[in-house]
């Protein structure tokens, strides 16, 4: 069972985003899709619904609503959480790293 989400360090999360996510994702409103979708407005949205991004059927069919907890669970092991996703990221195994990244994403994508 994945660890429960706990608010982390936004600053450490920003560093994690820059080193682990920025090559494929943007967070600002109106930001471009890259290899992965722009993440602005992701919280409260269902998986596979960022306008203008070509998702796999797996992402569209999963239908998960992104919350701090579901995002943390996903980031632990994306390919296990959504089998068939094209996200080529092995995941963040440490709950603290996931908490920090999700805390950053919650603010940066709002």
Swiss-Prot record:
Coiled coil: none annotated. Keywords: Electron transport, Heme, Iron, Metal-binding, Methylation, Mitochondrion, Respiratory chain, Transport. GO terms for molecular function: electron transfer activity; heme binding; metal ion binding. Heme c binds at residues 21, 24-25, 87. GO terms for cellular component: cytoplasm; mitochondrial intermembrane space; mitochondrion. InterPro entries: Cyt_c-like_dom, Cyt_c-like_dom_sf, Cyt_c_1A/1B. Binds 1 heme c group covalently per subunit. Belongs to the cytochrome c family. This is Cytochrome c. It comes from Candida albicans (strain SC5314 / ATCC MYA-2876) (Yeast). The gene is CYC1.
């Amino acid at each position: 069972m994945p660890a429960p989400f706990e608010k982390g360090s936004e600053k450490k999360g920003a560093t994690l985003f820059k080193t682990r996510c920025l090559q494929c994702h943007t967070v600002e409103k109106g930001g471009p899709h890259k290899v992965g979708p722009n993440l602005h407005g992701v919280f409260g949205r269902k998986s596979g619904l960022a306008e203008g991004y070509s998702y796999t059927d797996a992402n569209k069919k999963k239908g998960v609503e992104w919350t701090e907890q579901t995002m943390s669970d996903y980031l632990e092991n994306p390919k296990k959480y959504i089998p068939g996703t094209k996200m080529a990221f092995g995941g963040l195994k440490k709950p603290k790293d996931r908490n920090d990244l999700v805390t950053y994403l919650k603010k940066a994508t709002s």
